[in-house]
């Protein structure tokens, strides 16, 4: 079984009820953090997960709302782990990730220096191990495998999605994307698809062109549902709601998805959990 927790279901626009985009995936005793939007560690703490328990950080792309708390994750993992030899944090993301991580650590260089000077058991900066990928298998430990596939969030490029598998259960995390062949291939036959969504009907009615531009490179609720249907997934999990999902609107969003996808649809607030069991997907892709 794989457990998916929507840590942050918000967007770039600050929302008092929603943290920034981030999803926690637990499988085979391992814990994967997918993106790290604002407030991610507070939300992780609410489900009993600390920064020092993260097996790997997976980044779908380098938009600010998806990496806003990267520095907090790196520093907090470092200072809250008391093992004598802290292993590097695996960080897997698209090309450009290494530069972002390097610059983030530079931004915290004063803080890092203060802590090394103060604490005898902190002798080196936060250890990281960055892998930049666009396609292929990136993880295979203790019967958990992770595969990466390309998505389409242009002009943001390259962007990637992740497929996590464990003992016959599988979850795909799409990140921000429009419908594309790469995501269809990655999600084919998966137990669950976690997909960011927008309400195109609401956004296109707004007067600000910069806001309407969002429609260019995000999937609408209906498009995400169509992707799930084409891929034959068992559960569609919606997140990253734009505009923000207001209390009482859940059924409206779910109904839109249900016009294009006739299986289980999950939508909710931060900390919403979904269990994905082996064999949950009974439909072939196509």
Curated annotation (Swiss-Prot):
The keyword tRNA processing applies. Keywords: Endonuclease, Hydrolase, Metal-binding, Nuclease, tRNA processing, Zinc. GO terms for molecular function: 3'-tRNA processing endoribonuclease activity; metal ion binding. It is an enzyme of class 3 (hydrolase). Its EC number is 3.1.26.11. It catalyses: Endonucleolytic cleavage of RNA, removing extra 3' nucleotides from tRNA precursor, generating 3' termini of tRNAs. A 3'-hydroxy group is left at the tRNA terminus and a 5'-phosphoryl group is left at the trailer molecule. The active site is at residue 65. Zn(2+) 1 binds at residues 61, 63, 153, 176. Signal peptide: none annotated. Binds 2 Zn(2+) ions. Zn(2+) 2 binds at residues 65-66, 176, 240. The keyword Nuclease applies. Its cofactor is Zn(2+). It comes from the Bacteria. It holds the Pfam family Lactamase_B_2. PANTHER family: ZINC PHOSPHODIESTERASE ELAC PROTEIN 1. Homodimer. Belongs to the RNase Z family. NCBIfam families: PRK00055.2-4. Zinc phosphodiesterase, which displays some tRNA 3'-processing endonuclease activity. Probably involved in tRNA maturation, by removing a 3'-trailer from precursor tRNA. This is Ribonuclease Z.
């Amino acid at each position: 079984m794989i457990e998916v927790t929507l840590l942050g279901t918000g967007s770039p626009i600050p929302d008092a009820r929603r943290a920034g985009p981030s999803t926690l995936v637990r499988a085979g005793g391992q814990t994967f953090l997918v993106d790290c939007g604002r407030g991610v560690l507070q939300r992780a703490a609410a489900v009993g997960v600390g920064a020092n328990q993260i097996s790997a950080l997976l980044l779908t792309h380098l938009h600010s709302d998806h990496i806003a708390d990267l520095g907090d994750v790196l520093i907090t993992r470092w200072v809250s782990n008391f093992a004598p030899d802290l292993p590097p944090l695996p960080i897997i993301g698209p090309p450009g990730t290494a530069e972002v991580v390097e610059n983030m650590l530079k931004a915290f260089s004063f803080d890092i220096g203060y802590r090394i000077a103060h604490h005898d058991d902190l002798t080196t900066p936060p250890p990281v191990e960055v892998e930049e990928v666009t396609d292929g298998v990136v993880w295979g430990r203790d019967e958990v495998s992770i595969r990466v596939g390309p998505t389409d969030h242009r002009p943001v490029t390259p962007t990637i999605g992740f497929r996590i598998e464990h003992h016959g259960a599988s979850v795909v995390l799409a990140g921000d994307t429009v419908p594309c062949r790469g995501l269809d291939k990655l999600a084919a036959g998966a137990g669950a698809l976690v997909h960011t969504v927008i309400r195109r009907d609401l956004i296109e009615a707004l007067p600000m062109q910069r806001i309407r531009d969002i429609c260019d490179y995000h999937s609408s609720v209906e498009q995400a549902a169509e992707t799930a249907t084409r891929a034959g997934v068992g559960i569609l999990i919606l997140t990253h709601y734009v505009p923000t999902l207001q209390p009482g609107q859940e059924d409206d969003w779910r109904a839109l998805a249900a016009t294009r996808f006739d299986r289980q649809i999950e939508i909710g607030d931060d900390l919403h959990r979904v269990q994905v069991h082996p064999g949950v997907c009974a439909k072939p892709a196509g």
